[in-house]
Amino acid sequence: MTIPRRLLCVITDQQSNPVELARMALEGGARMVQLRRKSASGRDLFEWAVRIQALCREYEALFIVNDRVDIALAAHADGVHLGQQDIPVASARALLGPETLIGVSVSTPSEAAKAAEEGADYLGVGHIFPTSSKEKPMPPIGTSAIRPIIEASGLPVIAIGGIELQNVAEVIKAGASGVAVISAVSGSADPVAATRELVKRIRQ
C-alpha cells in the first residue's frame, strides 16, 4: 500500500464528533482520515474506528489510527501513525503485517533516516508553521526542512502543523507528497467546503 501524491489527510480534533467530521472530510475530497483523540477510551476509539473505516471504504480513501496499534488492528484500519515515543516501528509491523501502512512523526533528517531504516512507509513532518492544535516546545521547522528529510529517508512526506488554504501550495511546492490538517477543516463553519478548497489548492 502506498501514499497517493497530492493527498489531503484530515485529522480528527478533540471536540467534534469524529465520525461526522470524517464523513464531511471525505465528502469534500480528503483521501486520508486519521483518528486521533488522546483522551478517549479504547471502546470509544474502537467504535469510531469501525465506523470511519466503513466510510473510508465507501469513498475509497485511507484510514489511519493515531498511536493505537491495537485499535488499528481490531478495526482493520489501513494504517497506524506513530510518534517518537510510541511503540517501535518493527514491533508495530510484527503485529500489523507487511501490507499495513506505518507512518512516523519526525522533525529532523536523523529521525527520518531512523524511521526509514526501521521500515516506516511514510513520514509525518512538522510542525511546519505555528499551530494552536497543541503546545509545541520547539519552533516551527518551516518548509525548507521538507527536502532534507525526504533526501535522508527516501520516504513520502505528509506535512503537518499550521497548514491552511493560504500556505498549502507552498508546502506541496517544497516537496511534500501531501498535507495533514486539523483546525483548517474542523474549525471551519463548513468542513465540506473547507476540505474541497484545500484539495483544489493541493492539486493545482
Curated annotation (Swiss-Prot):
GO terms for molecular function: magnesium ion binding; thiamine-phosphate diphosphorylase activity. GO terms for biological process: thiamine biosynthetic process; thiamine diphosphate biosynthetic process. Its cofactor is Mg(2+). Keywords: Magnesium, Metal-binding, Thiamine biosynthesis, Transferase. 2-[(2R,5Z)-2-carboxy-4-methylthiazol-5(2H)-ylidene]ethyl phosphate binds at residues 131-133, 162, 182-183. It comes from the Bacteria. Mg(2+) binds at residues 67, 86. SUPFAM superfamilies: Thiamin phosphate synthase. Pathway: Cofactor biosynthesis; thiamine diphosphate biosynthesis; thiamine phosphate from 4-amino-2-methyl-5-diphosphomethylpyrimidine and 4-methyl-5-(2-phosphoethyl)-thiazole: step 1/1. It is an enzyme of class 2 (transferase). HAMAP family: TMP_synthase. Condenses 4-methyl-5-(beta-hydroxyethyl)thiazole monophosphate (THZ-P) and 2-methyl-4-amino-5-hydroxymethyl pyrimidine pyrophosphate (HMP-PP) to form thiamine monophosphate (TMP). Belongs to the thiamine-phosphate synthase family. This is Thiamine-phosphate synthase. It comes from Chlorobaculum parvum (strain DSM 263 / NCIMB 8327) (Chlorobium vibrioforme subsp. thiosulfatophilum).
